[in-house]
Amino acid sequence: SKLADMADWNIYSPKWAPVSLDGKWLKLEDKDPYDYARVERVIPATKELTVEFDVMAGQDSHGELDIEFVDDKGNACSRIVLDSLGVMKVKGGPRYGTLVKKYKAGETYHVKAVLSADMHAGTYYVNGKKAAQRQFDTPVEAITRVVFRTGPLFAEPNNETPADQSFDMPRADESDPLAVFSIANVKTTPSDADGQAAVLKFDDYKPYVDYFNGMEDENIKNAIPNSKAAEWMSRNVPLFDCPQENFKEMYYYRWWTLRKHIKRTPVGYGMTEFLVQRSYADRYNLIACAIGHHVMETRWLRDSTYLSQILNTWYHGNNGKAMQKMEKFSSWNPAAVYEAYKVNGSRNFLMTLKPSLEEEYARWQNTHRLDNGLYWQEDVRDGMEESASGGRKKKFARPTINSYMYGNAMALAEMNRLSGDNAKAEGYSKEAAGLKKLIEEKLWNKKHEFFETLKNDTAADVREAIGFIPWYFNIPDAKTYDAAWKQVTDEKGFAAPYGLTTCERRSPLFRTHGTGTCEWDGAVWPFATSQTLTAMGNYINNYPTPILGSKEFFHDMEVYVESQHHRGRPYIGEYLDETNGAWLMGDRERSRYYNHSTFNDLMITGICGLRPQADGSIIVNPLVPEGKWDWFCLDNVSYHGHNLTIIYDKTGNHYRHGKGLVLLVDGKKVAQRDTLGKLEYKF
């Protein structure tokens, strides 16, 4: 390697104080009485930092090496000095503490500094032994650089130095005895809660949490109360930044609301749908309807314990068996679990759940299969009662359950391939292929160019948002069925001022079932919005010539953001009026913080464009229209054992990590393009 390859270092190397590489050592030489060699390791701003390095002096009777830990303004909170008398010491306040009484020329010393900006103190070790503990010389907010410099900063010239002088500086053409210092194995380890973030810091977004905590009462507390929300979020959620305030606020609001539903049970964590008790809930007030959404959203938490235990509670929390009321609602759980695997990369996570997921799949096969090969479901068991096409006791072939079962079969096929059971994998693949054929042949209404519910042998003859769900699982062939997507931009279809409706607005059945009984005949449901936008993201990313793009996706996400407000505050509830945005259960306690949809999964996979892959490769394709935002960043994303950062910076001047779309892996730049678009990286 060469100095030019050291992208994370600032290097100052004048002629009489050069910097060079000598094998593993970074060598700083100095014979200049008026200058010095300097190298700086640039790091993300960090409050709790451990710095380790090896240092070797070429002499012990002259020369000086200063090692400083500085903030973004150049203030040094702490300084380690190898002085000209052979003493290694650390400055704290006006005095120095000794680290090594007499260091020896040519001997290697391993130095470790454990620094806390919050405590204004550092603990220092040499060769594995504690040598000193000192208060910081200067308080700093955070540390951003580690500086190695051959001598102190010069105090002159300064503002008081005369502009015109009639004499030469003393020894201007003379050199000092050559001093050589070498450093190697420099390692910085942040221990901030968000210490793996490369660009953003949680503290910059904590004011959102403070506002959410104070904007209304906290009458129900689960595992993580409001008082612990900021600490929990700093440790668990990816960080997001953009120039559009409402997007940013909603991103952190939805994480803040999600943790309200994490509940301790006797068998581990569970995740609720309602905070209030519901009579029809399973043990621990759990409801199975939105498990798929819970998995898709929770898969992005940095601590995978939450998702693992939530799923374990569902599948083994009933005396070792699945929860009793799990089959009360349709399930795309196996498919969602496989999508979570695409993020965490944990084969053990998948294999632990596989037997239970296969048992669940078999139960649906045994109870909900029609003679024609499709699956039936009552609309209320889809979580979609009072719908335009179904009924609470109508056993119709709906796009929901059939798409779910296809997705589940495909996921189980992949799980069995991973476990080496290719025969079983092939069986699931054939099951999925058969369902795909039936969905395309029997649920596609050619007249309406839409996937619709099949009532016995007759199409329901009404377009509903559930007709987009086949794309949630990438079922339809390309081009043949694309016309369905025209309906999301058609105001007679699903486009409304406050979101995508659950039934087409032109239908005579639209909003005919009354109000206040959870109707799915047209009002906007975030449950459905999440499914439709996930499907749209798949359609735009995975199909060759989509008739929609980032413009339409961003518009619908923007409306989704705007709709999540009630009485001037961020809000997520059950469902809302499509024309005026009024939450139809908005003042009922049951509706507040309703955990029945995704949002941040759409922000991560859609807006920021991170498309998870089972093999751990990285595809980034942000669905932000050109010219909409000049910058945005998604940081501290845990992905297959790595930390990802996605940056878009039109000019390169906002985040200063380069111009255009940039991908960092573990803080290192691995891919870049000048404009928004697809970026790919394989390890």
Tell me the role of every PLM-derived stretch:
Residues 419-453, 483-642:
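Non-catalytic carbohydrate-binding regions of carbohydrate-active enzymes
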Residues 22-88:
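Secretory/extracellular carbohydrate-interaction modules
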Residues 134-181:
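Flexible glycan-contacting loops in extracellular carbohydrate-active proteins
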Residues 245-283, 300-323, 366-397, 437-524, ...:
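Extended glycan-interaction surfaces of carbohydrate-active proteins
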Residues 90-112:
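Short, aromatic/His-centered strand-loop micro-motif at the edge of beta-sheets
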Residues 2-25:
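Extracellular glycan-recognition surfaces and repeat-rich motifs
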Residues 191-282, 347-349, 358-363, 414-418, ...:
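Acidic/polar, glycine-enriched structural segments that form the non-catalytic walls/loops
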Residues 202-208, 226, 284-379, 383, ...:
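Aromatic-rich carbohydrate-recognition surfaces in CAZymes
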